[in-house]
Amino acid sequence: MGLGRVTQVMGPVIDVRFEHNEVPEINNALVVDVERDEGTVSLTLEVALQLGDDVVRTIAMDSTDGVKRGTEVRDSGDSISVPVGDATLGRVFNVLGDTIDLDEKLDTSVKRDPIHREAPAFDQLSTKVEILETGIKVIDLLAPYIKGGKIGLFGGAGVGKTVLIQELINNIAQEHGGISVFAGVGERTREGNDLYYEMSDSGVIKKTAMVFGQMNEPPGARMRVALSGLTMAEHFRDVQGQDVLLFIDNIFRFTQAGSEVSALLGRMPSAVGYQPTLATEMGQLQERITSTTKGSVTSIQAVFVPADDYTDPAPAAVFAHLDATTNLERKLTEMGIYPAVDPLASTSRALDPTIVGQDHYEIARDVQSTLQKYRELQDIIAILGMDELSEEDKQTVERARRIQFFLSQNFHVAEQFTGQKGSYVPVQKTVEGFKAILDGEYDHIPEDAFRLVGSMEEVIAKAKDMGVEV
């Protein structure tokens, strides 16, 4: 175990000089004891570069307040490691695997795995394609999720990415009883706190491990916390043979943290000021999220889109790895349609007749073509009004509006705000409901009856409450 001395401190980046034959390897964890007002604190550093002359450049996982030149640094001889296995369920951790909830500390005998590792080899990968039912109509019908796939939730600020993730955690735990790992990467501490207490109240927390590196933490923690969460998920997949869900909120903050330290590490910035290693860092994370012959890790990642610009290098780097995208659209939130998922922009490679079946595929495509036709007619309606449309076009518009409203539904996790009970709709009921709308079976029911309901039975009940004969 080598000993070194701090030679330079630049915010979250610290240079350390070691003896000639004791220079630590890249990704090794180093430990510094720092004197602060509250006493002596252990600060963990991760080796990022070897600069030559026995100096390494490191990234701090916590605040560097109190670190001085000449402070002694110890090489741990290994990379950062986090606890894995059943002991992590129901607990909240930081990037280093230390518990940050109010319960007692984990036993030191709990197994720990290093956060840096290779992706599974080709011969270990599974090629089986299976749909993951979410109970959310717009997703299950138009952009279904694949077990062991990677799904991106794209949207600007405040369009509902985190609420959608919370609903997915709730639905999958309640309906499928699956294990989830939640990695909070650079998001609001309040949201993490709310999520923890909501999950505790619903009992879902017993099946979930949570890892947080929030907005107020240094970029080193935000950059590595996704790997900490992934390592916990990999153990459930590889050792216990489980199908695990890994939620990352928000993957953009992972990139943002990398760009914050990149310049301090001495790298030349690339497009829009991002780090030149953007594609490599993203690939190293995403390639580990996969299905193997032992089990699967299905990843659902919220992706913040800066200024709603999908060509920005950060969201573009994520796109390349995804099996399905769920695009959230601000215009839909303005119309009061929740979840505000854009039915035309959201995609999935699972929307294929050989995977979902011919009926589901045809109804999904008919729904999309009806909505597309409605979108094309909106300019004419805005200028000339509905009266100028042909009878066929009027019928298309009326059905499209019913479809648009029927794609919305109440969420379980939003019950406390809306006062409405949440809905879980099985795929079969979703497909039957949209088929009935396309066939004109419900043309006599006012479109308001389709807003924020679950199955078609709820539409009929709502219409009766409105005094309509069904």
Swiss-Prot record:
Coiled coil: none annotated. This is ATP synthase subunit beta. ATP binds at residues 155-162. The keyword Nucleotide-binding applies. F-type ATPases have 2 components, CF(1) - the catalytic core - and CF(0) - the membrane proton channel. CF(1) has five subunits: alpha(3), beta(3), gamma(1), delta(1), epsilon(1). CF(0) has three main subunits: a(1), b(2) and c(9-12). The alpha and beta chains form an alternating ring which encloses part of the gamma chain. CF(1) is attached to CF(0) by a central stalk formed by the gamma and epsilon chains, while a peripheral stalk is formed by the delta and b chains. It is found in: Cell membrane. Its EC number is 7.1.2.2. It comes from Staphylococcus saprophyticus subsp. saprophyticus (strain ATCC 15305 / DSM 20229 / NCIMB 8711 / NCTC 7292 / S-41). Keywords: ATP synthesis, ATP-binding, Cell membrane, CF(1), Hydrogen ion transport, Ion transport, Membrane, Nucleotide-binding, Translocase, Transport. One of its GO terms (molecular function) is ATP hydrolysis activity. It catalyses: ATP + H2O + 4 H(+)(in) = ADP + phosphate + 5 H(+)(out). InterPro entries: AAA+_ATPase, ATP-synt_VA_C, ATP_synth_F1_bsu, ATPase_a/bsu_AS, ATPase_alpha/beta_chains, ATPase_F1/V1/A1_a/bsu_N, ATPase_F1/V1/A1_a/bsu_N_sf, ATPase_F1/V1/A1_a/bsu_nucl-bd. Belongs to the ATPase alpha/beta chains family. The lineage of its organism: Bacteria, Bacillati, Bacillota, Bacilli, Bacillales. GO terms for cellular component: plasma membrane; proton-transporting ATP synthase complex. Signal peptide: none annotated. It is an enzyme of class 7 (translocase). Its main location: membrane. Produces ATP from ADP in the presence of a proton gradient across the membrane. The catalytic sites are hosted primarily by the beta subunits. It is a peripheral membrane protein. It holds the Pfam family ATP-synt_ab_N.
